[in-house]
Amino acid sequence: GDLECLEGGAAKLAGADGRGAVMGFCWGGAQTFRFATDAKDLAGAFVFYGTAPTDNAALARIAVPVHGFYGADDQRVNATIEATRSAMLALERPYEAVVYDGAGHGFMRAGDDPAAAPELRAARDAAFARLTSLLAKAK
């Protein structure tokens, strides 16, 4: 698919160091989780307010760390986190979900607004700090 082509092309760039990751938001977050079901050479998958596949056979194929970023006020997506966490744990697959207080769906974009509530900005800042820390540690 498109991400596989992009991944292969990016690996050939002069500045590439062999590390790659995938990140998506909302629908793209769900696609990031889906991509992780077949990816083998990624340093990680970073899912922002996206849902996981519900097929345990697909989840069982995940071989890369999946890092979830969720807003506490996003009931639709958050209703899926525990089932995902339980399935990934039972399958012994790497999944870490963090839920940020004061944030809803789309909090990374909404938290960038200078007029955003302080709690929303704090959630965005904490998620961004976590993302950059995880990327720096990626191998």
Give the predicted meaning of each segment.
Residues G1-M23, K137-A138:
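Gly/Ser-rich "nucleophile elbow"/oxyanion-hole loop immediately N-terminal to the catalytic nucleophile
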Residues G9, R34-D38:
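Active-site signature of alpha/beta-hydrolase-fold catalytic machinery across serine-
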Residues G24-G28, T32:
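Gly/Ala-rich beta-loop-alpha elbow adjacent to hydrolase catalytic centers
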Residues D41-T51:
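A conserved short beta-strand
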Residues I62, G68-Y70:
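Short beta-strand/loop motif that positions the catalytic acidic residue
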Residues A72-N78:
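Acidic catalytic loop of the alpha/beta-hydrolase fold
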Residues N78-M88, Y100:
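Short alpha-helix in the alpha/beta-hydrolase fold that links the catalytic acid
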Residues L89, P94-K139:
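C-terminal catalytic histidine-bearing segment of alpha/beta-hydrolase fold enzymes
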